């Protein structure tokens, strides 16, 4: 991927325990599915392992959330923030500007239309321009 690449392709496995991001055939992110948010502002403070370490050990104004339960989104906003934070960890230093994201996301085969819409919306709000869902597939 060069200096002027316009699109970055990533595959994401949103898991209840861990979320994995793959790009160029390599796992580049493998982090716990946890996000830490400021209770007052709802801004993301940490994601993944850093957020997991904050669980029940932080200031009362910080809450840690596992946004997925049983493979589906339980907290839409927290999931979006977690996805944004994890996507930022993907190496994009070689770009003059941030590329648009083409995302493939594995979802449980029994997902309802509402759950699928929540995954798609979270991915789009997290920066995905083209979002594709693959049913009953785990990338890990």
Show where each model-derived region lies.
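Nucleotide/phosphate-binding catalytic cleft detector across ATP-hydrolyzing
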Residues: 1-140
């Amino acid at each position: 991927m060069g200096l002027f690449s316009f699109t970055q392709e990533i595959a994401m496995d949103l898991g209840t325990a861990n979320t994995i991001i793959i790009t160029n055939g390599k796992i580049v992110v493998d982090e716990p599915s946890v996000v830490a948010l400021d209770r007052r502002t709802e801004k993301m403070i940490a994601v993944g392992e850093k957020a997991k370490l904050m669980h029940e050990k932080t200031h009362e104004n910080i809450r840690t959330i596992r946004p997925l339960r049983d493979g589906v989104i339980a907290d839409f906003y927290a999931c979006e923030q977690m996805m944004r934070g994890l996507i930022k960890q993907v190496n994009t230093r070689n770009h003059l500007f941030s590329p648009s994201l083409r995302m493939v996301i594995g979802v449980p085969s029994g997902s309802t239309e509402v759950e699928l819409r929540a995954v798609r919306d979270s991915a789009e709000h997290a920066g995905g321009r083209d979002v594709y869902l693959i049913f009953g597939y785990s990338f890990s």
